């Protein structure tokens, strides 16, 4: 199994334990900061500083942060730029623990309500995030399987960023368009041709997923 996984992608040059700890703590605090900011933006919309209120009014950042796409992109970046698949699992799990905990602690103790059904979805997603991160880390490998993984990840991201049917196609917001473009850049292959092929296959897969499972996460 180890040889099979190494054929997909090898671990990067090892880093010191101190560096690993610093990176993981930084990712934890990033999650805490983003979770707190997301809930603050949602709860204090009428009391935001004028500049932030104007930006939020144009881009609807509050609702954007309430959907899945941006968090999947951040987790993807943390995963594939981690030193190894195991480190990807740890870092992504720590990020979601920080983000989800800070968001719902703010919601419960400052905003004064606790949306149990949504919280359970995020708790469940956090629980499985190490496994997903482990798999996603291999998407930046050089093998055909890595190529397929990249296309599958982009297909899922596509369906989180766009809504479409027989006679319509819309982006959820301009920010989601940016998220998908960044996803393409992050998962790009060695050549433009391969990257274009990956993007095309991912869109075809997204349409197939939409037919088989016509349910989009946030």
What are these regions (language model features)?
Residues 161-173, 180-196:
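Membrane-helix boundary connector in multi-pass membrane proteins
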Residues 69-79, 125-137, 177-183:
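Hydrophobic cores of alpha-helical transmembrane segments in multi-pass inner/ER membrane proteins
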Residues 131-144, 184-198, 207-210:
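Membrane-water interface at the C-terminal end of transmembrane alpha helices
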Residues 101-170:
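Membrane-proximal helix-loop-helix units in multi-pass membrane proteins
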Residues 206-218:
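Juxtamembrane boundary at the C-terminal end of a transmembrane helix
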Residues 1-100, 104:
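N-terminal topogenic module of multi-pass integral membrane proteins
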Residues 26-38, 156-160, 180-185, 202-207:
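Hydrophobic core segments of alpha-helical transmembrane domains in multi-pass membrane transport
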Residues 90-99, 148-157, 194-207:
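Central hydrophobic cores of alpha-helical transmembrane segments
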């Amino acid at each position: 199994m180890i040889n099979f996984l190494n054929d997909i992608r090898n671990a990067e040059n090892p880093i010191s334990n101190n560096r690993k700890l610093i990176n993981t703590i930084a990712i934890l605090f990033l999650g805490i900061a983003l979770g707190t900011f997301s809930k603050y933006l949602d709860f204090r919309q009428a009391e935001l500083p004028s500049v932030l209120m104007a930006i939020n009014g144009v881009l609807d950042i509050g609702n954007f942060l309430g959907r899945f796409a941006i968090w999947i992109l951040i987790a993807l970046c943390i995963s594939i730029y981690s030193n190894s698949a195991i480190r990807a699992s740890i870092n992504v799990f720590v990020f979601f623990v920080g983000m989800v905990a800070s968001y719902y602690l703010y919601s419960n103790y400052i905003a004064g309500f606790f949306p149990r059904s949504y919280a359970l979805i995020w708790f469940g997603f956090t629980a499985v995030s190490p496994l997903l991160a482990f798999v996603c880390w291999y998407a930046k490998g050089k093998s055909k399987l890595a190529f397929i993984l990249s296309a599958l990840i982009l297909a899922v991201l596509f369906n989180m960023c766009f809504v479409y049917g027989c006679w319509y196609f819309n982006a959820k917001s301009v920010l989601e368009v940016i998220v998908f473009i960044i996803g393409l850049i992050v998962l790009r292959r060695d050549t433009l041709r391969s990257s274009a092929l990956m993007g095309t296959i991912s869109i075809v897969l997204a349409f197939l997923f939409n037919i088989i499972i016509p349910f989009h996460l946030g």
